[in-house]
From Swiss-Prot:
Organism per entry: Clostridium acetobutylicum (strain ATCC 824 / DSM 792 / JCM 1419 / IAM 19013 / LMG 5710 / NBRC 13948 / NRRL B-527 / VKM B-1787 / 2291 / W)
EC number(s) on file: 1.6.3.4
Region (Zinc metallo-hydrolase): 32-216
Subunit structure: Homotetramer.
Protein name according to UniProt: Flavo-diiron protein FprA2
Family statement drawn from the similarity comment of this UniProt entry: In the N-terminal section; belongs to the zinc metallo-hydrolase group 3 family.
PANTHER family named among the record's database cross-references: DIFLAVIN FLAVOPROTEIN A 2-RELATED
Domain Flavodoxin-like: 257-397
BP terms from Gene Ontology: reactive oxygen species metabolic process; response to toxic substance
Induction: Up-regulated upon exposure to O(2). Repressed by PerR.
Domain of life from the UniProt record: Bacteria
Chain positions recorded as Fe cation 1 binding sites: H79, E81, H147, D166
Keywords for this protein: Detoxification, Electron transport, Flavoprotein, FMN, Iron, Metal-binding, NAD, Oxidoreductase, Stress response, Transport
One Pfam assignment: Flavodoxin_1
Length: 400
């Protein structure tokens, strides 16, 4: 992708990666992505962010098509994740005169990301400014946990543009770089929501704070680090509202308690039903959802476990362990926002019964509010086991 002019003396110099299908191990990217970076020309020339290290050569050529790299004065690192900072060390080798600007956390991170002891990095704070001449003054706003502790926004009020790095971005490879030129809008909208879910949903209070910063500005453009640039005539307002809607806490007087389970021969399922009945006997108005997880899409289960008020996990023990679908679901728990959420586990076993102790241990490591040590029975639940399972559900409900 060649350099693209956004406004007079402001250019997109990032690169496309249309073949990317998995990002950061955790996220599918069906439509590829872009690593966006920006160049502002003034009396001082400024780069905003770099790109993934594998794409440095293309990135450098895009810069060269606008200015000589030796004339770059500053590189602003809004966020130091390697897909944005990965080319900084090599850029420094080509342009050793550069001065880097980052948040205080970013300054610390860059030392160990670049391993360049002589790299000049200055930390800024909210409302600090950088006058680059020609009537352009960059203003900084620290925006922690959007989505790293180092994140910040760079704002050019004179040109009504905010550079927000990952915030409001999307893994969507649009070569024409503007939201008004998106060809497959439903696919973009799907990717936009998936990006929020994977990257920003753990940080909803910080998302709201970031939106408040942007809402106080008169903006024609929001230039993100992935996906098309958001424009006033395009999706800028709608994208902000979508993030605000997704980050608003849903108030409900009805507790949502899903029971996730898998059951090889129906014995763990029997326990699941009795525990549910026990919970219902105490919390009559609770929404208790029974979920045999092999029949559901993982992304749906992940959303449920993270939005619920409390949950139970049921698994038999097979080959001295819990079953993979349960471990996969546990891997989807948002440890940031699920801290102290009531949870427990149950299951039938036939030989050694390690599954439930393992699951309980992991839930404790995630800092959930774990009820007792779970509940188990040997093979087929007896009448006494069924009564105890019901009581376990009752007691769990009382603990919520």
């Amino acid at each position: 992708m060649p350099a693209i002019k956004i406004k007079d003396n402001i250019f997109s110099v990032g690169v496309l990666n249309p073949s990317l299908r998995i990002f950061d191990i955790i996220m599918k990217t069906e439509y590829g992505t872009s690593y966006n970076a920006y160049l502002i020309k003034g009396k001082k020339n400024v780069l905003i962010d770099t790109v993934h290290g594998r794409f440095f050569d293309e990135y450098l050529e895009n810069i060269k098509s606008v200015i000589d790299p030796s004339s770059i004065d500053y590189v602003i690192m809004n966020h130091c994740e390697p897909d944005h900072s990965g080319s900084l060390a090599r850029l420094y080798e080509v342009a050793p005169q550069i001065k880097v600007i980052a948040s205080n956390a970013g300054k610390i991170y860059l030392k160990n990301i670049t391993n360049k002891e002589t790299l000049d990095v200055k930390a800024v704070k909210t409302n600090d400014t950088l006058d680059i001449g020609n009537g352009k003054v960059l203003k900084f706003a620290i925006a922690p946990f959007l989505h790293w502790p180092d994140s910040m926004f760079t704002i050019l009020e004179e040109d009504k543009i905010a550079f927000t790095c990952d915030f409001l971005g999307c893994h969507f490879c649009e070569p024409r770089m503007f939201d008004t030129k998106i060809t497959y809008m439903p696919k973009y909208e799907k990717s936009f929501k998936e990006y929020y879910d994977a990257i920003f949903s753990p940080f909803k209070p910080y998302v709201v704070k970031g939106l408040d910063i942007l809402d106080a500005l008169d903006l024609d453009f929001i230039a993100t680090s992935h996906g098309p640039i958001l424009t006033r005539e395009g999706l800028l307002a709608a994208s902000k509202q979508k993030y605000r809607d997704l980050s608003s806490e849903i108030q409900s007087t009805t507790k949502y308690i899903p029971i996730f389970y898998c059951s090889a021969y129906g014995n763990t399922e029997i326990l699941a039903n009795e525990i549910a009945s026990g919970i219902k006997s105490v919390l009559n108005d609770a929404n208790i959802e029974m979920l045999d997880i092999i029949n559901y899409d993982y992304s749906d289960l992940k959303e449920k476990i993270n939005i619920c008020d409390a949950f139970m996990l049921g698994t038999p023990t097979i080959n001295k362990d819990a079953l993979f679908p349960i471990w996969e679901l546990i891997g989807g728990i948002d440890a940031v926002n699920c801290k102290n959420k009531p949870a427990s586990a149950f299951g039938s076993f036939g030989w050694s019964g390690e599954a439930i102790p393992f699951v309980i241990s992991r839930l404790k490591e995630l800092k959930l509010k774990v009820f007792q040590d779970g509940f188990t029975c040997l093979f087929v639940p007896s009448e006494d086991d069924i009564k105890k399972a019901f009581k376990f559900g009752e007691d769990f409900a009382k603990s919520i």
